[in-house]
């Protein structure tokens, strides 16, 4: 489906879309409440770093992220088209730096972080938005030629760099979000689904071959856990999913109450990270979990609406990519916690622990807000 833009010129209204502001505020404020509740679980686990964890999340993640949101909102989104290739190149180089001894950090079998001394950063988070921006810029330049072989080449070429680097880390969760986001931009630009499907099947074939090697066998284990969770051992690959489902189910319709969850204290792995949606559902119930899902769904619909009303093709494609990235990441996380998809390790947007993810997500939201200011005069 090709994205159709308004032909009239854009004008800076000075005001962001009100509904978008409300949705973002609800997710950010609600996410802060749920993170605070989930962080209490560290006390029962004997952690002495709860103050540092909370400070890093709110000061470096939310606080600095809101500053970047304001910056993203203040910069004319069309300027990102000029710097797109340089930003993408910088993000690729930064993501490669995780392999430099003494700088790169390894955790849980993956090399995904850079140690700056006073803070650690995950450069692949920057790669998400950089890939979206460069995709929007390139496909906007192609215009009608997006439906030709040039469009397919652009899709494959932009995805190839992140694919090679993230496969070495390995981090297929982040790679999946990048590919989904680029895919959305490509489809909106007019690239044929059949062509992308053929390329996608080839990529899946390569991934299946990789799972036969020891380094990537964990991918096969996660898929096997998703297909047959009952066959896993009590503390095996299916443990996190089972504990997540227990937490979600025990919340009932209205939940145990904010801060009253039990699973976060000892049983639920990563209650502030991947599993925070389970904490939301246990404490706020089916109603609270449903509201969380509904907010993300509305955010996606609003983002695509902004894309359709954008005065130029680049703005429309950029809005599609950002909306897909922010909402797609959330739905992938939630689906895994509900046992509807394999575990990927991607965070719940605006809610999970992770300063780099929070900062980039908020900056991306700022860019989307700026696009919403550019509606043509009626």
Residue spans for each PLM region:
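Glycine/serine-rich anion-binding loops at beta->alpha junctions
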Residues: 117-127, 168-170, 252-257, 345-360
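Positions that flank functional sites
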Residues: 42, 263, 296, 356
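Flexible extramembrane loops and terminal tails that flank transmembrane helices
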Residues: 2-21, 37
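Transmembrane helix boundary and interhelical junction motifs in multipass membrane proteins
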Residues: 171-176, 256-261, 271-273, 290, ...
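Short linear Ser/Thr-Pro motifs
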Residues: 36-40, 261, 352
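TM-adjacent membrane-interface loops and short helices in multi-pass inner/ER membrane proteins
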Residues: 226-273, 286-288
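Hydrophobic alpha-helical transmembrane segments of multi-pass inner membrane proteins, especially
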Residues: 21-29, 33-37, 43-240, 278-339, ...
């Amino acid at each position: 489906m090709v994205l159709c833009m308004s032909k009239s010129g854009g004008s800076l209204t000075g005001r962001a879309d009100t509904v978008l502001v409300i949705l973002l505020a609800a997710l950010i404020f609600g996410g802060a409440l749920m993170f605070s509740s989930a962080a209490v679980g560290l006390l029962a686990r004997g952690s002495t770093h709860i103050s540092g964890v909370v400070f890093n999340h709110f000061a470096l993640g939310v606080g600095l992220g809101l500053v970047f949101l304001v910056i993203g909102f203040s910069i004319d989104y069309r300027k990102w088209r000029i710097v797109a290739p340089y930003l993408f190149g910088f993000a690729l180089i930064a993501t490669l730096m995780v392999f430099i001894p003494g700088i790169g950090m390894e955790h849980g079998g993956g090399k995904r972080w850079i140690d700056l001394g006073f803070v650690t950063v995950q450069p692949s988070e920057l790669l998400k938005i950089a890939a979206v921006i460069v995709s929007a810029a390139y496909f906007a330049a192609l215009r009608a030629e997006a439906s030709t072989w040039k469009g397919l080449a652009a899709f494959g070429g932009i995805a190839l760099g992140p694919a090679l680097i993230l496969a070495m880390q390995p981090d297929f969760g982040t790679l999946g979000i990048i590919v989904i986001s680029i895919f959305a931009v490509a489809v909106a630009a007019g690239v044929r689904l059949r062509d992308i499907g053929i390329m996608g099947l080839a990529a899946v074939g390569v991934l299946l071959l990789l799972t036969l090697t020891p380094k990537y066998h964990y991918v096969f284990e996660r898929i096997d856990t998703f297909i047959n969770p009952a066959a896993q051992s009590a503390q095996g690959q299916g443990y996190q999913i089972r504990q997540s489902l227990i937490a979600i189910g025990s919340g009932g319709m209205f939940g145990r109450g904010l801060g009253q969850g039990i699973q976060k204290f000892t049983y639920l792995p990563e209650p502030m990270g991947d599993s925070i949606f389970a904490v939301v559902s246990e404490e706020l119930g089916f109603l609270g979990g449903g509201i969380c899902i509904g907010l993300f769904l509305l955010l996606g619909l609003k983002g695509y609406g902004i894309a359709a009303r954008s005065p130029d093709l680049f703005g429309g494609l950029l809005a599609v990519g950002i909306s897909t990235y922010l909402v797609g990441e959330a739905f992938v996380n939630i689906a895994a916690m509900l046992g509807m998809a394999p575990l990927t390790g991607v965070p719940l947007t605006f809610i999970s622990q992770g300063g780099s993810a929070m900062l980039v997500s908020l900056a991306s939201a700022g860019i989307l807000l700026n696009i919403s200011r550019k509606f043509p005069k009626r």
